[in-house]
UniProtKB/Swiss-Prot annotation:
Glycans are attached at residues 53, 90. It comes from Homo sapiens. The keyword Transport applies. One of its GO terms (molecular function) is voltage-gated monoatomic ion channel activity involved in regulation of presynaptic membrane potential. Changing residue 17 to A: Suppresses the effect of okadaic acid and increases activation time constant. Predominantly expressed in brain. In brain, it is expressed in the cerebellum, cerebral cortex, medulla, spinal cord, occipital pole, frontal lobe, temporal lobe, putamen, amygdala, caudate nucleus, corpus callosum, hippocampus, substantia nigra and thalamus. Weakly or not expressed in other tissues. This is Calcium-activated potassium channel subunit beta-4. The keyword Transport applies. Pfam families: CaKB. Changing residue 11 to A: Suppresses the effect of okadaic acid and increases activation time constant. Phosphorylated. Phosphorylation modulates its effect on KCNMA1 activation kinetics. N-glycosylated. A highly glycosylated form is promoted by KCNMA1. Glycosylation, which is not required for the interaction with KCNMA1 and subcellular location, increases protection against charybdotoxin. It is a multi-pass membrane protein.
Length: 210
């Protein structure tokens, strides 16, 4: 029995292989929960928005300014200001007036405005960026219809110009944790099976020559 027990002991390489497999299994499960919490839920909410056709009703500054944070080096940060511009549109899904936003991130950052410029140290540069964006929607887009995204249940008074997430995000949320988990399981199973076959082969060899 002692000899049989020794035969079933794993070598250092086999032990490391099993440990690696278990680590990958745990990593796959943990990453699935992390991706599900950080990416999957926001992506599902974003994908619930319905594609619609929007036309511009009005483009105007409302006379309010908001602060943004700029960086000027590794340990250098500061705040500057930008004016608030609002673009109201009519969307084909609800046939109602709604405030346009660049994307979900911009909506959550400043739900009152349609655009947040790249934050610069000088307020004048922020103003110029907003003015250029405002002029684009007045002159280039005008009354031309464009694609927007509308969520009747969550935000009936807002529409998005771009989706932050798409179906690819959902694929990655499931694919990589699943691949990690499956690879871990395969490593553990193949290591155990290989050891079991080696022990059986050794036992048969001993019986043959005994």
């Amino acid at each position: 029995m002692a000899k049989l027990r020794v035969a079933y002991e794993y070598t250092e390489a086999e032990d490391k292989s099993i440990r690696l497999g278990l680590f990958l299994i745990i990593s796959g499960v943990v990453s699935l929960f992390i991706f599900g919490f950080c990416w999957l839920s926001p992506a599902l909410q974003d994908l619930q928005a319905t594609e619609a056709n929007c036309t511009v009703l009005s483009v105007q500054q409302i006379g309010e300014v908001f602060e943004c944070t700029f960086t000027c080096g590794a340990d250098c940060r500061g705040t500057s200001q930008y004016p608030c511009v609002q673009v109201y549109v009519n969307n084909s899904e609800s046939n109602s007036r709604a405030l346009l936003h660049s994307d979900e991130h911009q909506l959550l950052t400043n739900p009152k405005c349609s655009y947040i410029p790249p934050c610069k140290r000088e307020n004048q540069k922020n103003l110029e960026s907003v003015m250029n964006w405002q002029q684009y929607w007045k002159d280039e887009i005008g009354s031309q219809p464009f694609t927007c995204y509308f969520n009747q249940h969550q935000r009936p008074d807002d529409v998005l110009l771009h989706r932050t997430h798409d179906e690819i995000v959902l694929l990655h949320c499931f694919l990589w944790p699943l691949v990690t988990f499956v690879v871990g399981v395969l490593i553990v199973v193949l290591t155990i099976c290989a050891k079991s076959l080696a022990v059986k082969a050794e036992a048969m060899k001993k019986r043959k020559f005994s």
